[in-house]
Regions:
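Catalytic domains of carbohydrate-active enzymes, especially glycoside hydrolases
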Residues: 29-45, 252
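Short acidic capping loops at alpha-helix termini that bridge into adjacent secondary structure
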Residues: 166-168
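Active-site-adjacent loop and "lid" segments of alpha/beta metabolic enzymes
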Residues: 16-30, 49-71, 77-78, 84-86, ...
C-alpha cells in the first residue's frame, strides 16, 4: 500500500502555508491531525525550498524543528526531517527522526552523506541541480525522466561510497525542482525509469506550480478575477489535483507520496488500490 507523508512546515515562507505552524505547539497539533488522517510519516521542515526562498541558518532551523520532532517521535510516529543541512539532520535523528529527506541529494552540504551514514537513518535523495534561486535556469532536458534517473544513479553511487546501505535509500525525482511546466509531466509519465533503479520511490507534487498552471488552463475559479496569479487557483483545487496525481502514481509502483492534504490523498489512494485489485 502506498505510504502518505504528511507535510509539517515549521517555516515563515513556505509557498503554501508559511508561518501557519511556526509555533511548535501548533506544528505538533497539525502533525497529530495529519497522523489521524492517515499519514504514515510526518515530514518536518524548518526551511522553505520553494523557488527563490532565502536560506535559513542551521541553528535557526534546528530551533524550529527539534522540539516538534522530539514530541512527535516520542508518540511513536515515524518522522522525517526535511533539510539540506548535515548538522540539522544529525540533530533531528538524535531527537527521534527516522528519515532524512534531502531535496539536494547531498549536493547542498558536503557533510550530509557522512552525517546520514553515521546516523543510521534512512535517506531520501532528491533530484536537484542547484539552489532554489536559479533552479529554473537549470531546467534543460532532452529526455527528462531518463536524465533524472541517470543523475539519481550518480547520487546513489555517492551515498553508497559514503557508507549508506541501499536498503536505507529512497529516491525522489524532485518534481518542481529544476523542472519547468511540462517537464514535470514528462518525469511523472516516465516514473518507470526511476522505479527501475530498484529503490523505494517518493514523489511530491503537492500544490506545486505545474499543477496550478494546468488547473488555470482548465478554467479559473468563479470567485477570482482572471490573471490574478497563483491565487486564482484555490487550495482545494490544488489538493484535488495532488490527490489525482497520487492515485495515478500507484500504477508506477511509487512507494510513498508527500502531501499537505492527507485525508484527500488517503481517499484517492484507497480508490486507486481498489481499482488495481
Amino acid at each position: 500500500v502506498t505510504g502518505i507523508w504528511g507535510i509539517v512546515n515549521v517555516t515563515t515562507d513556505s509557498f503554501s502555508d508559511g508561518g501557519r505552524y511556526l509555533d511548535p505547539d501548533r506544528a505538533i497539533a497539525h502533525g497529530l491531525e495529519l497522523r489521524d488522517a492517515g499519514a504514515t510519516v510526518l515530514d518536518v521542515g524548518g526551511e522553505s525550498t520553494r523557488p527563490g526562498a532565502e536560506r535559513v541558518d542551521p541553528a535557526v532551523e534546528e530551533q524550529r524543528v527539534i522540539p516538534v520532532i522530539t514530541e512527535l517521535a516520542a508518540r511513536g510516529i515515524a518522522v522525517s526531517v526535511d533539510t539540506l543541512n548535515a548538522s540539522t539532520a544529525a540533530a533531528a535523528v538524535g531527537a527521534g527522526a527516522r528519515i532524512v529527506n534531502d531535496v539536494s541529494g547531498g549536493l547542498a552540504d558536503p557533510d550530509m552523506l557522512a552525517a546520514v551514514a553515521a546516523s543510521g537513518a534512512d535517506y531520501a535523495i532528491g533530484h536537484w541541480r542547484g539552489p532554489s534561486d536559479d533552479m529554473y535556469a537549470r531546467a534543460d532536458y532532452l529526455r527528462p525522466s531518463r536524465e533524472v534517473a541517470g543523475e539519481l544513479r550518480e547520487r546513489i553511487g555517492e551515498a553508497a561510497a559514503a557508507g549508506i546501505a541501499p536498503s536505507r535509500i529512497i529516491l525522489d525525482p524532485g518534481i518542481g525542482f529544476a523542472k519547468a511546466g511540462a517537464q514535470n509531466w514528462d518525469v511523472l509519465r516516465g516514473l518507470g525509469d526511476i522505479t527501475a533503479l530498484g529503490y523505494r520511490v517518493l514523489i511530491g507534487t503537492s500544490r506545486k506550480r505545474f499543477l496550478v498552471e494546468t488547473l488555470r488552463a482548465a478554467g479559473a475559479d468563479p470567485s477570482t478575477s482572471p490573471g490574478s496569479g497563483a491565487d486564482d487557483v484555490s487550495v482545494e483545487r490544488r489538493d484535488l489535483a495532488t490527490a489525482v496525481t497520487s492515485a495515478l502514481a500507484v500504477r508506477h509502483d511509487v512507494w510513498a507520496v508527500r502531501v499537505h492534504d492527507v485525508a484527500a490523498t488517503r481517499d484517492a489512494l484507497a480508490i486507486a488500490h481498489a481499482w488495481e485489485g
